[in-house]
């Protein structure tokens, strides 16, 4: 489980399949779109078979109602957008009960769900995605059913404490004295694949152990394995993983223009270094994907005395210029801040309501 109204964006061929209507894409073209910027697919052979045999498969991503969503969530919104463009029915699970299992206080649970319910669709609006095939599902709407509860008990007879703890180790905050709820978490996430009728579950690579847990144990309780698709985790602004619990590492969806500019200005961005560079990573996984799908170039503005403006058609061009030190960190940061502020416009347009919901959910 990862810790509306958008408009269709036509691509001018920088990713060659984006300009096609969904119905005109071949299975091979859909595969390449789904694979874009992924780290691992388990298994690609199963995905190829699915694309050839099922007209409209279903993919789901779950996000637990815990910390306040940040711009790193745009990475998975873009990947879900790729699935939409490939003709999938896409489900986003707003996992309120998972939030409680991972430390959200029960009195705040519904308030955090309401906050997520408001901001998650705006992620798709920010990247210009047509979401008519997107379905947002509240976890407790189906996870409280008698059949789900029976399956959860049945599942618990097939797994050990160590199985559950190992599966959830990178996702759940266990601490020195782990609570039982953290061991229930991976069982529910596995069953969600079944109850959401998903062919694929998508998540960050930090979900890998839970996804493999699902593949191993679902057949033991009578359900088929699903395909698992993972994308990398992008570094935060201070070089570590971008985290909702560390305000210095991330840009909040509700940050104003000054907040964004200040955070990017102070971000780790050592000249010529790609590793742990959150600014470059956001360029790769968000900004340049959106630019390319729109058929746009990235223009980095510079005074003539410093060589004038730079134009880039791809992330690879940016990285080459950066590692060869033809692109200065300050110029990269200025461009990133400008593009991030554009992406955050849908959130700022609804600032009053978002702030109200945020204050209630995160007092």
What does each of the following model-derived ranges do?
Residues 95-107, 231-237:
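Short connector loops at secondary-structure junctions
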Residues 107-230:
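Divalent-metal (Mg2+/Mn2+/Ca2+)-assisted nucleotide/phosphate chemistry catalytic cores
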Residues 38-103, 201-210, 214:
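N-terminal catalytic cores of NTP/NDP-binding nucleotidyl/phosphoryl-transfer enzymes
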Residues 70, 120, 239:
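Divalent metal-coordination and catalytic microenvironments
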Residues 76, 107-109, 246, 283:
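Short secondary-structure boundary/capping segments
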